Amino acid sequence: MGIKGLSQLIADLAPFAVKEGEIKNFFGRKVAIDASMCLYQFLIAVRAEGAQLTSVDGETTSHLMGTFYRTIRLLENGIKPVYVFDGKPPDLKSGELTKRAEKREEAQKALDKATEAGVTEDIDKFNRRLVKVTKQHSNEAKELLKLMGVPYVDAPCEAEAQCAALVKGGKVYATATEDMDALTFGSNILLRHLTFSEARKMPVQEFNYDKILQGLELTRDEFIDLCILLGCDYCDSIRGIGPKKAVELINKHRTIEKILENLDTKKYVVPENWNYQQARVLFKEPEVANPEEVELKWGEPDEEGLVKYLCGDRQFNEDRIRAGAKKILKTKSTATQGRLDSFFKVLPSTPNPKRKIEDKKTPASKKAKTTGGKPGRKPK
């Protein structure tokens, strides 16, 4: 879900924090990509006659098709992608996951009715709502990335948090995801629509975290509280408080505790046993791997390995797979070209005078499994 209404709020109150551009603008950049979000996009978008692509055994291959060609597109535009996969979801997310399961049950019932009635449009709509990224989808995508020579990271917990940690640690330039909570985790740069197909003609949106805080006149802690008020994956929000009211309350009281002390509870319903404090800690100190211990290597593709993996039972066209492997190999020759700004030292941005001095805590750190470089190499 991400953060409800945050992108529109930023567009309204801090428009200078967002810029739109083409994919080629990120030539020479290393980008951490939310893998689950990508696979979900591919499972929904890569279809034939309303159904997902499958192997001869009926196994879904849409996610592999999307990963292969979309990654090649990124590489051809000079981007070095690293895919970050979700680990175990935090306990606080159980409520959100239950809601999603209930929605899928409702979609299944609606699909059964649509199938019985023979309404093709509704069948396609409810089929898409039933899409879920499984562990098998993720494992198959990881094997494909290894054969392509593209690194990936197994996050110990939330992928967006790990992406943000890689950005803050200087390992990559940005986080690429559609979920706005990458900003709540503190990613300096968030890219949306980076992995969309060319056919959709959607410009890449680049969100700048420091400029967002400047535009909203908030500290990092206040921004996290704002995101919790807007609605996140880890706890309910106060019923009746929309985006504008949330900003107004944070600007006036600065913390959720102060808001609760002054809130008109007859007008606004506070969730029972509201665990906003645990959600706050999760955003401030997420369970992530130490970026310094994450090694990222981009290697050469294993053409024969790709043909063996994707053709045959999975029914990919061999000529196209070989052509794709050659495209990846060709990008290696341009990979040595850096961006002009990489030759200069980047000075830290001038801090907003309204931002307070905050207690800097080191995030809880775990080892992440990483792979890449030589094809076929197993995660450590």
UniProtKB/Swiss-Prot annotation:
**Region N-domain: start and end of each range?**
1-104
Residue span of region I-domain = 122-253
Required co-factor?
A: Mg(2+)
Among the Pfam families in the record, one is XPG_N
* Bias (Basic residues): 363-380
* Residues that coordinate or bind DNA: 47, 70, 158, 231, 233
Modification after translation is described as: Phosphorylated. Phosphorylation upon DNA damage induces relocalization to the nuclear plasma.
Q: What is its EC number?
A: 3.1.-.-
Q: Alphabetically list the UniProt keywords.
A: DNA damage, DNA repair, DNA replication, Endonuclease, Exonuclease, Hydrolase, Magnesium, Metal-binding, Mitochondrion, Nuclease, Nucleus, Phosphoprotein
Q: Per its record, how is this protein called by name?
A: Flap endonuclease 1
Organism encoding this protein? Aedes aegypti (Yellowfever mosquito)
Indicate where this protein is primarily found.
nucleus
- Write out the GO MF terms: 5'-3' exonuclease activity; 5'-flap endonuclease activity; DNA binding; magnesium ion binding; manganese ion binding; RNA-DNA hybrid ribonuclease activity
